[in-house]
Regions:
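Short, small-residue-biased leader/transition segments that mark boundaries at the very start
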Residues: 1-16
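Short hydrophobic alpha-helical segments enriched in small aliphatic residues
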Residues: 22, 27-30, 38, 42, ...
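Arg/Gly-rich low-complexity intrinsically disordered repeat tracts
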Residues: 48-49
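Short, Lys/Arg-enriched N-terminal segments with co-localized hydrophobic residues
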Residues: 74-87
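Active-site entrance/lid segments in N-terminal catalytic domains of soluble metabolic enzymes
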Residues: 85-249, 253
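Conserved active-site-proximal phosphate/metal-binding subdomains
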Residues: 233-255, 261-402
Length: 402
């Protein structure tokens, strides 16, 4: 028998359903202790079906619900409170054929095959970061990915990469199925990639760019806000403002990025109109990340004001404040031109900081949520924590009303 509590009946239907596409909720059910009686389940099902206009009845097929009932009746629960479980299937999970709508950012010097395969093996979508790989190294990581996972995965390719033609040839030749592009226009490469059956996603920082991406045929959009680490948009629009604007501007699935690290922030992104999230910083300091231990520790030591956008005359980049950052800021404050900043930047600054561990002269790219991270975790621990925190957050929202 279900113990009746406010939390079991006060579920935020409209909050969740407005944030996701109509087909995004596969099934939502409440379970208490040992078994749930069929009539009680059917009442909950009827309430779910008719309490909102966003739920699609076509998903309510009898066979699906019968199989879910069988699953419920064969599992006991000993918790003292009703738990609300969310099993989602939306346009993002369908597009990539993944369990959770969680994508790991393809970060330079962090996102090798170990990190990306771990994310894919734990239900998300892992991305190799091609921006810090020579062509031969990319081939090596692609082949190791194929050995490490049989789950979907992809590659992030900055379109301003100097050997972009060679990278795209490798991606096509190696049969990569998913490509995220960034730092440039997707107009040239999207038709070619899609002609080879590749799913294409592009990173944008404004609703205007989202519309242009839809026009050239990309399959989804990553809307990345001001909080994100590394290369950033010139608009300096926060994620809280960017996501609803992008979601309203185009019909493509929107993946939120920038300042997202927990289940709470995933829930927030979805209520704003996203159907998935891309997480960079938290995965950058995961155990499987190829980042140097000194870089990870510096991230853990960073407080709320410890990062700032720099290099705005070149490509706006969020960095940890270190000696290199101070040199950049001094030049910018003095009105330096792009050529002077380029000379200071030189080559290999990001590698020096993130991969080699030079905390003084290296370029330390990381997001604002660094201040929320305090220890190294495995990818499995991160994924488990995000999912549990999301479910707990959505359950708590059921008790909130204005």
């Amino acid at each position: 028998m279900i113990r009746r509590q406010q939390r079991s009946t006060s579920f935020p239907y409209t909050t969740l359903f407005r944030s996701l596409s109509a087909e995004s909720i596969f099934v939502i059910f409440a379970i208490y202790k040992n078994k749930i009686h069929e009539t009680q389940f059917e009442r909950f099902y009827q309430k779910l079906q008719y309490s909102n206009t966003f739920f699609t009845r076509s998903l309510m097929q009898q066979k699906h619900w019968e199989s879910r009932l069988i699953d419920i009746r064969h599992h006991g629960y000993s918790d003292s409170y009703i738990k609300i479980h969310y099993i989602m299937e939306n346009r993002v999970t369908k597009l990539f054929n993944i369990k959770y709508p969680i994508i790991q950012g393809g970060m330079v010097w962090c996102s090798g095959w170990r990190l990306a395969s771990a994310v894919s093996n734990n239900g998300g979508l892992g991305l190799l970061g091609a921006g810090s790989m020579h062509p031969e190294m990319l081939v090596e990581h692609i082949r190791k990915m194929k050995e490490a996972t049989d789950k979907p995965w992809g590659i992030n390719v900055p379109l301003l990469y100097p050997e972009i033609d060679r990278l795209m040839d490798i991606i096509i030749q190696e049969g990569v199925k998913i490509v995220f592009t960034s730092a440039g226009s997707p107009k040239k490469w999207t038709p070619l990639l899609k002609s080879h059956g590749i799913t294409v996603v592009h990173v944008v920082s404004s609703a205007l760019f989202a519309k242009k991406c839809e026009e050239v045929g990309v399959d989804a959009i990553v809307a990345e806000g001001f909080e994100a680490g590394g290369h950033n948009g010139r608009e300096e629009t926060t994620t809280l403002t960017l996501i609803p604007n992008v979601a309203a501007s185009c019909s493509l699935p929107v993946i939120a990025a920038g300042g997202i690290s927990s289940g709470k922030s995933v829930a927030a992104a979805m209520t704003l109109g996203a159907e998935g999230v891309q997480i960079g910083t938290r995965f950058a300091v995961a155990a499987e990340s190829s980042a140097h231990p000194a870089f990870k520790q510096r991230v853990f030591d960073t407080d709320e004001g410890g990062t700032m956008l720099a290099l705005k005359k070149l490509a706006p980049t969020r960095l940890i404040k270190n000696e290199f950052f101070n040199q950049v800021k001094a030049l910018e404050d003095a009105g330096a031109e792009a050529a002077q900043l380029t000379e200071l930047l030189g080559k290999g600054r990001a590698k020096k900081g993130i991969f080699e561990g030079d905390m003084t002269e290296g370029e330390l790219e990381i997001g604002q949520i660094a201040s929320m991270l305090h220890k190294e975790e495995t990818v499995a621990e991160i994924m488990e924590d995000i999912v549990a925190d999301f479910n707990k957050t959505m359950s708590k929202l059921g008790d909130l009303k204005l």
